[in-house]
Amino acid sequence: MLCFVAHQKNNRIYDYLFIGITVILSFICFSNRELFMKLAFIPYRTIRNHEYYRIVTHGFIHADMTHLLVNMFTFWSFGLYIERTFRYMGFGSGAYLALYFGGMIVASLYDLIKRRNDPYYVSIGASGAVSAVLFTSIFLDPWGKILFFAVLPVPGIVFGLLYLAYCQYMA
């Protein structure tokens, strides 16, 4: 057990990497509309111009500070648990990366099909990837507590429902 605990100090590498890239790109895109439109998920352009990179890049930019903070706080709150659990279960970092990027990609597929003929539809944010991490955590420990607004302990399943409501409101 001591080896497992000592090894956990470095478990956040992907969390910090994803958060760092997302924060930096989001801040740049807050003031650079051209880059924002180049990275955003626009199904019409994705299909017509074969710009499939957009299925991933849109997950690293956000509309505003609130959008960025909610997604990154949620990811940070649940990411460590999933990264540790996956390593403990022998899945390793590859499974964690697959979960994150898989969530991002799968969440985009519906809009890719439904909105492929709409040149004005634009989607951004890491909600698909964050939802994959969040709901994997809830699946593994539905009653685990998270400090909502850093003070109110709520079960993960309740936080998940609140996060879904927020995502729906922002959509």
What residues fall within each predicted segment?
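A detector for small-residue-rich transmembrane helices and their helix-helix packing motifs
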Residues: 1-171
